[in-house]
Regions:
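Glycine-rich FAD pyrophosphate-binding loop
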Residues: 3-23
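Generic enzyme active-site microenvironment
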Residues: 11-12, 130-133, 266, 273
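Active-site metal-binding loops of divalent metal-dependent hydrolases
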Residues: 15, 263, 269
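Active-site-adjacent segment of FAD-dependent monooxygenases/related oxidoreductases
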Residues: 23, 27-94
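C-terminal helical "tail/cap" subdomain of flavin- and related membrane-associated enzymes
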Residues: 46, 293-375
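Conserved FAD-binding catalytic core of PHBH/FMO-like flavoproteins
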Residues: 93, 98-100, 106-245, 254
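Glycine-rich phosphate/pyrophosphate-binding beta-alpha loops
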Residues: 249-255, 270-282, 314, 331
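FAD-binding beta-loop-beta segment adjacent to the flavin cofactor pocket
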Residues: 249-265, 317-318
Length: 375
């Protein structure tokens, strides 16, 4: 975005080769709108899988707990299930075409008045603006007040071949037993250069239990998954080594102010939380768009940074609060919250105007900071 405005942009990448890291995810209508602005939606859609609803049921009785349909939006638009490599490839290529300079094998650990310092102690020239997009454990954000709080629960995830029927290729599907067990399957399209369709499989797990899970071997765990959701048997057959499953560790923090002198913080570096509402990548894209728009509108840097912080404040705070509030209904010990979820919230969610409100919530549209959006 900034390079297309005619600015010289340098990206410092901590690894020797820039590459995607992480599970498949959902691009929500807010994130897709940013890609629309960049003219990149079509390239992502060619690799992605349209998702028109999110469905969750309780395992014992099959009670529907979650049923969110994007058709309930005033302006319906499906989400996309995306393999992380697909979005990376499209954005990386666009950056190179726009003239962005990428310096690899440079981990930046500090920023002061437009100058960056790397892990080896080397300093960069002074930049007009530093944008910290280095993730939830950013050392730059930590120096400006970010206090990352690890959450007790995370998830095991793996990329698998798409299993086909009876799984719905247009839905994120989840099955729960209480709030302590959850298994999900998300269709994520394909990787660049590989036509085979894929899924992201995930299993809720306390991070403290990860070592015990590995030590026990896959078969006892597979038996648990099959007992919860028998249809996953074929999918589980593709998992033969614990190393195929990666533990995602979740944490929560919200930076009090995402700006400082010649510094803007975006994405998980500014605000991270559980992915229960599926907003992480989309929030980062929104941050980038709002920041670029503020810089284009106002040549005065402090004023532009203040506008960025102001326009993102309430949207970020709302979704951070919603995520923190909803997560214990899906990832927690105890029986009270899942009982409320199964017997009360599930029924209330079917009463108007709840279906539209839920669709707007998971789409990221509540308090959307973009002035051109009308729901």
């Amino acid at each position: 975005m900034l390079a297309r405005q005619g600015r010289r942009v340098v990206v410092f990448e901590r690894f020797r080769q820039a590459a995607p890291v992480g599970a498949g995810f959902m691009l929500q209508p807010t994130g897709l709108a940013v890609l629309d602005d960049l003219g990149l939606t079509g390239a992502v859609e060619a690799l992605a899988q349209p998702i028109d609803h999110i469905f969750g049921r309780e395992a014992r009785r099959g009670r529907v707990v979650l049923d969110v349909r994007y058709a309930d939006l005033k302006r319906p638009r499906a989400a996309l299930g995306v393999h992380r490599a697909a979005l990376f490839e499209v954005l990386h290529r666009a950056c190179l075409e726009a003239g962005v300079v990428i310096e690899t094998d440079r981990e930046m650990v500090a920023a002061s008045a437009g100058r960056l310092s790397d892990a080896c102690g080397a300093a960069t020239p002074v930049f007009d603006l530093v944008v910290d997009a280095s993730g939830a454990r950013s050392r730059i954000a930590a120096a400006h007040g970010a206090r990352f709080r690890p959450l007790a629960w995370g998830a095991l995830w793996a990329t698998t071949p798409w299993p086909g029927a009876p799984f719905d290729e247009a839905a994120l599907q989840q099955v729960y037993r209480g709030a302590a067990k959850m298994v999900g399957v998300l269709p994520v399209g394909s990787r660049p250069g590989a036509p085979d369709r894929l899924a992201t499989f995930f299993w809720s797990l306390k991070t403290a239990d990860h070592v015990a899970w590995r030590d026990a071997g896959l078969e006892p765990w597979k038996a648990q998954v099959r007992a919860l959701w028998p249809e996953t048997t074929g999918l589980l057959d593709s998992l033969t080594d614990p190393d195929q499953l990666t533990l995602a560790r979740y944490g929560h923090h919200t930076l009090a102010s995402p700006v400082a002198e010649r510094l803007a913080v975006i994405g998980d570096a500014a605000h991270s939380t559980s992915p229960q509402l599926g907003q992480g990548v989309n929030m980062g894209l929104l941050d980038a768009r709002v920041l670029a728009d503020a810089l284009e509108r106002d040549e005065d840097l402090p004023a532009a940074l203040a506008a960025y912080a102001r326009r993102r404040r309430w949207h970020v705070r709302l979704y951070q609060a919603l995520s923190l509030g909803f997560t214990p209904f899906y990832q927690a010990d105890g029986r009270v919250r899942p009982w409320i979820r199964d017997h009360l919230l599930g029924k209330l969610a079917r009463l108007p105007p709840s279906p539209r409100l839920l669709a707007a919530t998971v789409s990221g549209l509540l308090l959307d900071p973009r002035p051109d959006v009308r729901r």
